[in-house]
Amino acid sequence: MAKRNPSIDTKNLTAVQLMELDACVRCGECVKWCPTYAASGEKPGLAPRDKILRWRQYMNKSYGLKARLFGPQEIPISELEEFKDDVHGCTTCGICSTVCEAGINTVELWESMRANLVKKGIGPYGKQNMFPKLIGQYRNPYMKDQKDRLAWVPPDVKIEDKADIVYFTGCTAGYNQLALAFATSRVLNKLGIKFAMLGEDEWCCGSALIRTGQAHINNVPYELAKHNVEAIQKKGAKKVLFACAGCFRAAKVDWPRLLGKELPFEVVHVSEFLAGLIKEGKIKWEKSINKTVTYHDPCHLGRHVGVFDAPRYVLSHIPGVKFVEMDRIKEFQRCCGAGGGVKAGLPDLAMAVAESRVKDALDTKADILSSCCPFCKRNLMDGRDSLKVDLVVEDVIELVAEALNLETK
């Protein structure tokens, strides 16, 4: 009788991750904090602990002592398909890793599980499977023409051909959420900051592919990172500014990992850059906002990279802003619901998480819910509209632009 092959393999799982599967002590702390588990009505399969225990069970069935003695046990494809749905029902926000008593790096574990299944033809989820083809062909996920990368730039914005600073716009801000690009570019001009942009040479950062377990398909993320780094170098940049938290995380964490070396320039989020200018007394405000503002930490900016204080510092120094905090902030913040491909693959789940976060903001009595991420802004606006409540959702850079008496349209 032919020996059965294991239903799963160890591809994409490092030795550390294999040990992490055994490190879970089933305490359930992650279950209490998981935003998608809560928003789903506590569907058991979405709990972080459940995903680890199930994958550990799969590994034992495939490679444990009994498997070595008597051959691997078959795992029905229907069961793996169900697991695929659950592992993709995660925004990769990282709160489970933050509260994990065993210190398991769950974000990278989920991404490895996703990649493992995708390589076996199981997953990704829904529209997520279009990402490699779209981004590989169009260099952006929206099927937009690369020639239109700078179509949004208004006549009043001055861009240098080469400069020490490059503003990396990002696909979402450059094609869909133009207010973010308008605000960032005009603020930089107003402050006398000379900057260049990549234009047609700006390609997608690759974040969506990596988060959904598709980094290996045609090696697209590597090609994106390599091209963007070379394009930035050609501009003579020493510093690259990002207003998109997802792009920032990709450049800060993923690009060096993909390329196997440190980047030849500094990667800075615009909130960090502005906080530095405020401390140096280089921003002269022209208008008072006179609103109560709260702040939502984007997962990619906060938990993933550790930028928590800069956006708060900026907001607290805008004239007329009364800054208030929500109940869950910084390392323990509640995700907006858009990350990890959930907005594209499971929009109803993304909406449910967003509604929970909007309710957090409403509890503060704030007039404005701010963030530093176009995906957070979009999903929080959707959550607000679903709840039919009166709450302005704006990016921090938009509030800065307003206080400098600049247009964001």
Swiss-Prot record:
Query: Any idea which positions bind [4Fe-4S] cluster 1?
Result: 24, 27, 30, 100
Taxonomy, superkingdom:
Archaea
In which pathway is this protein known to take part? Answer: Cofactor metabolism; coenzyme M-coenzyme B heterodisulfide reduction; coenzyme B and coenzyme M from coenzyme M-coenzyme B heterodisulfide: step 1/1
Q: Where is the 4Fe-4S ferredoxin-type domain?
A: 14-44, 81-110
Give residues annotated as binding [4Fe-4S] cluster 2.
34, 90, 93, 96
- Gene Ontology biological-process entries: methanogenesis
Keywords in alphabetical order: 4Fe-4S, Iron, Iron-sulfur, Metal-binding, Methanogenesis, Oxidoreductase, Repeat
Keyword check for Repeat: yes
Catalyzes what?
A: methanophenazine + coenzyme B + coenzyme M = dihydromethanophenazine + coenzyme M-coenzyme B heterodisulfide
Q: Which Pfam families match?
A: CCG, Fer4_8
What does this protein's record comment on cofactor binding? Binds 2 [4Fe-4S] cluster.
What's one GO MF term for it?
A: metal ion binding
Describe its assembly.
The dihydromethanophenazine:CoB--CoM heterodisulfide reductase is composed of two subunits; HdrD and HdrE.
Chain's role: Part of a complex that catalyzes the reversible reduction of CoM-S-S-CoB to the thiol-coenzymes H-S-CoM (coenzyme M) and H-S-CoB (coenzyme B). Electrons probably transfer from phenazine to the high potential 4Fe cluster in HdrD subunit, then to the low potential heme in HdrE subunit and finally to CoM-S-S-CoB.
**Family membership noted in the UniProt record:** Belongs to the HdrD family.
Something else the entry says is: Methanophenazine seems to mediate electron transfer from F(420)H(2) dehydrogenase to the dihydromethanophenazine:CoB--CoM heterodisulfide reductase.
Protein name, UniProt field: Dihydromethanophenazine:CoB--CoM heterodisulfide reductase subunit D
Lineage of producing organism: Archaea, Methanobacteriati, Methanobacteriota, Stenosarchaea group, Methanomicrobia
